[in-house]
């Protein structure tokens, strides 16, 4: 069944600007200065407010803004990942000796992630990344290491998230709603001092995360899998590998994800591909044409990906040579998180029409490139969503009459 029947539906990738009230509450919760019941009341009320605003603007497929993924400051590029740390047992913070910080040099057929600081784009533009890039300044943010069997301990948190979203969307007129969750491949980017192999580490994360996936879909929501590692991991292999070696390397994570999705309804699943949401040059982004077949092999109904920013806007033409499987749909970004410029609604409409030409108007949902929360000033983020909704209405009039 096509996703669209009489118009282009709209959505976004997940993270929306946290309200000042929620940011203050998250900070207070972390330092123990707020009662838990008071915090939960604030979270519930702010989730309602962010859903109401999406519906008011004209977003059809809404979410909770990822408000359950805590941010205690306005600029935060990592809440989509960091939230998983508190929901997983078997992790430990180390003051030194974190293997994720080690520099590695890969060889043909023997690829291994190097450290984040040793990424090829980051070393090429070292002065920019050192002096200009603001990823948020959270002195308490540390990355854990797997030191024991991984277990899922986020039942209460995910239960709270789906209850808040269910209450917030009840009777509000949204088309549907989704909840974002981390992929095994991205989760396994933390250090590992327990599992003998990287494959065992990734599959351990798959066993952990499939519990969260099931809780989301059992609640009736669409599950969005966030997995930047499929695309942006390319930049973290140093030196640059062959494309074939890289695709073989990420296949383990793709297989682990499909394993975790075995009991999840495909029609309730969408997958998010991106090249990392930081405001950097992205000169080493792997071209989408190399990733398209891998993307379509993932057991999801919808595929969301960057298609509006200066590095990837031209790649809509790749879909001219791809066959979108029956029952699948695309969710291209038609406004971007990477610039403060507000996209004109006519440009948004043109971008939607480009995808409609190559995959069919019934199979396109208009979206953002990546999450907007923590990456743009809140006023700009909401203005971009307004432009997205207006552009979708323009495209709908031309495509559906």
What name fits each language-model region?
Residues 1-401:
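Domain-level signal for soluble alpha/beta catalytic cores
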């Amino acid at each position: 069944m096509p996703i669209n029947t009489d118009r282009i539906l709209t959505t976004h990738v997940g993270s929306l600007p946290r309200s000042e009230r929620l940011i203050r509450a998250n900070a207070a919760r972390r330092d123990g200065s707020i009662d838990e019941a008071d915090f939960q009341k604030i979270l519930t009320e702010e989730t309602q407010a962010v859903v109401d605003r999406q519906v008011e603007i004209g977003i059809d497929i809404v979410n909770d803004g990822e408000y359950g993924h805590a941010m205690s400051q306005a600029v935060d590029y990592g809440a989509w990942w960091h939230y998983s740390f508190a929901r997983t047992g078997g992790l430990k913070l180390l003051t030194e000796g974190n293997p994720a910080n080690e520099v590695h040099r890969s060889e043909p057929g023997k690829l291994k992630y190097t450290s984040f600081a040793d990424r090829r784009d980051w070393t090429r533009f070292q002065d920019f990344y050192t002096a200009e890039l603001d990823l948020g300044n959270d002195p308490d943010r540390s990355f854990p290491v797997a030191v024991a069997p991984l277990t899922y301990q986020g039942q209460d948190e995910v239960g709270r998230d789906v209850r808040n979203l269910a209450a917030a969307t009840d009777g509000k007129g949204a088309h549907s709603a989704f909840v974002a969750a981390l992929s095994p491949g991205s989760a396994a980017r933390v250090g590992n001092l327990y599992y003998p192999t990287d494959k065992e580490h990734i599959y351990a994360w798959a066993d952990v995360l499939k519990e969260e996936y099931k809780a989301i879909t059992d609640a009736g929501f669409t599950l969005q899998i966030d997995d930047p590692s499929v695309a942006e991991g390319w930049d973290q292999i140093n030196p640059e590998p062959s494309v074939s070696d890289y695709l073989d390397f990420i296949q383990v994570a793709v297989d682990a994800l499909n394993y975790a999705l075995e009991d999840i309804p495909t029609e309730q699943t969408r997958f998010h591909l991106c090249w990392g949401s930081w405001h950097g040059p992205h000169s080493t982004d792997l071209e989408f044409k190399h990733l398209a077949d891998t993307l379509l092999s993932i057991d999801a109904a919808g595929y969301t990906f960057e298609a509006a920013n200066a590095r990837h806007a031209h790649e809509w033409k790749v879909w001219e040579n791809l066959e979108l499987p029956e029952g699948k749909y695309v969710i291209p970004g038609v406004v971007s998180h990477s610039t403060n410029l507000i996209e004109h609604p006519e440009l948004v409409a043109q971008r939607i029409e480009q995808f409609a030409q190559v995959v069919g108007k019934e199979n396109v949902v208009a979206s953002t490139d990546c999450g907007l929360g923590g990456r743009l000033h809140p006023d700009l983020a909401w203005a971009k969503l307004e432009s997205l909704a207006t552009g979708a209405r323009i495209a709908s009039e031309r495509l559906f009459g």
